Amino acid sequence: MVLSIRSQIIIGVVSSILLTSTILAIAYILMWFNGHMTLTLTLTTIITSCLTLLICSIFINPLIQKIKQFNIKTKQFANGNYASNDKTFNSPKEIYELNQSFNKMASEITQQMNQIKSEQQEKTELIQNLAHDLKTPLASIISYSEGLRDGIITKDHEIKESYDILIKQANRLSTLFDDMTHIITLNTGKTYPPELIQLDQLLVSILQPYEQRIKHENRTLEVNFCSEIDAFYQYRTPLERILTNLLDNALKFSNVGSRIDINISENKDQDTIDIAISDEGIGIIPELQERIFERTFRVENSRNTKTGGSGLGLYIANELAQQNNAKISVSSDIDVGTTMTVTLHKLDITT
């Protein structure tokens, strides 16, 4: 049975009266006090206890009301009403401190809930946009496949063009699936073991798949080492993905026949390596340069059939960089080009 504060006080006062009366009765039986004195002491005890109860009630009633209000407040919060409640309790001290602690907890939980809702909304929009992006290449693949199957496309140059489109759309689908996979695994806390990296060999493995595309688009790609860089420890898998995404971005947003430069430099004082990928593309206006790594920004502004993909490459690259002891910075001029620089911190591997 759970008793209220008022009930507990009343029980305490009544118990005090009964205990005092019992002691006085025993004292009377033992003839420590005469009858008149015992009666006087008993009445005095009862009157004093009643006055004490009255005074306690005067002070305790406001406290009880505050506790009831605080209880209502906590129930509303427990039921999902996270609206701000500015009601404060200035006294007594314990109630004030309890209210302050609750308000702090409520504020933190509200922020977390809002963040969760925002992230959930972003994920929903992201999935919807990716689903929309998947429809376009699939529709194109189905259309050209049916045309080839049914004999609608018969001329040699049309057949070759159709195969080129099918390959292009299949590659686009592959990129979309890669982006979806990386988005799913970004926040899973997956870790990668540090590996000894020889940078020239790493770049060869990254650039090799682009060889045919660079030749086909009549581009020039140059890799420049400012100095000889010794092997160092870093997270190879995320680094490969970061550089691949930045290179993809440079190729997407620059014209056929343009130049791509990769410049590598080392800062031995800070124990860092800079890998700068520069293009001669359309550039990025200054007010958008800080937003290009946002997930929603890229989804909203890069979804088009010309560039392909989901527009999430820079977001994925930046997230991987932050998670793996690296940083990406951007420098760009409109109609001149963009330079994306990855700054790697060499890992200190102690045995």
Curated annotation (Swiss-Prot):
Domain HAMP: 61-114
The keyword Flavoprotein appears for this protein: no
Listed EC numbers: 2.7.13.3
Membrane topology: Multi-pass membrane protein
Protein name per the record: Histidine protein kinase SaeS
Coarse class of the protein's main subcellular location: membrane
CC annotations in GO: plasma membrane
A biological process from GO: cellular response to phosphate starvation
Post-translational changes noted in the entry: Autophosphorylated.
Stated role: Member of the two-component regulatory system SaeR/SaeS involved in the regulation of staphylococcal virulence factors in a strain-dependent fashion. Probably functions as a membrane-associated protein kinase that upon sensing the appropriate signal, autophosphorylates and in turn activates the cytosolic response regulator SaeR.
Top-level taxon of the source organism: Bacteria
InterPro entries assigned to the protein according to its UniProt record, in alphabetical order: 2-comp_sensor_kinase, HAMP_dom, HATPase_C_sf, His_kinase_dom, HisK_dim/P_dom, HisK_dim/P_sf, Sig_transdc_His_kin-like_C
Catalytic reaction(s) noted: ATP + protein L-histidine = ADP + protein N-phospho-L-histidine
Gene that produces this protein: saeS
Entry-linked SMART domains: HATPase_c (SM00387), HisKA (SM00388)
UniProt keyword annotation of Ion transport present: no
GO molecular function, one term: phosphorelay sensor kinase activity
Annotated transmembrane regions: 9-29, 40-60
Domain Histidine kinase: start-end pairs: 129-348
Modified residues (Phosphohistidine): H132
Record keywords, A-Z: ATP-binding, Cell membrane, Kinase, Membrane, Nucleotide-binding, Phosphoprotein, Transferase, Transmembrane, Transmembrane helix, Two-component regulatory system, Virulence
Localisation: Cell membrane
